[in-house]
Amino acid sequence: MSMTAQEFESLMPDGGRLLSDEPEMESSLHYAQLALLVSCLEWHWRERDDFFIGANLTVYYSRDQLRHREFRGPDLFLVKNTRRRPRNSWVVWEEGGRYPDLIVELLSDSTAGSDRGPKKRLYQDHFRTPEYFWFHPETLELAGFRLDDGVYKPILG
C-alpha cells in the first residue's frame, strides 16, 4: 500500500515536539571540527536564506525509528531550498518528505564502523542523499561519495 506525503504526515507525531536525541560530542576536537564546518558553510552562504544546516541534530524519518531509537543523526547535514529557521531536529514528514542534500560524518574510533557501513547504506538507499563525506580529525582520513544511479561512487579518498 502506498500513501501520500499528507497521509504519512497525519500518522506521525508533531515534529515541533521532537527534540534532537543526539549524544554528547566525542571530544573537544570533534566539537571544534564541527563548529568550523558549520561556520564556513554559514559564512559562504551568508547572503542566502534558502538552506538549513543541522549539526548534531536527529533526522526523524520513520515511525520505526521513533519507536526503536535505532538511528543517530549525522554530525552535519545540509538541506538546500528550504526555509532557514531554527529547528530542534529535522522531521522529514514535516519538511515535505525532504532528506539532507549533503551529509558529513566526523569519524572517531567508536563511530567509524557505523559511519562507513550501516549509515552509509542508509544515506544511500533510504535517504538518497546526493553527497556523503566522512573525515577523521585525528588521522585526517577524508572520503567523499556522490550518488550515481542510486549507488555511492567515490569522489574523494
Q: Which residue ranges define each predicted feature?
A:
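Gly/Pro/Ser/Thr-rich low-complexity, intrinsically disordered segments predominantly at protein N-termini
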Residues: 1-157
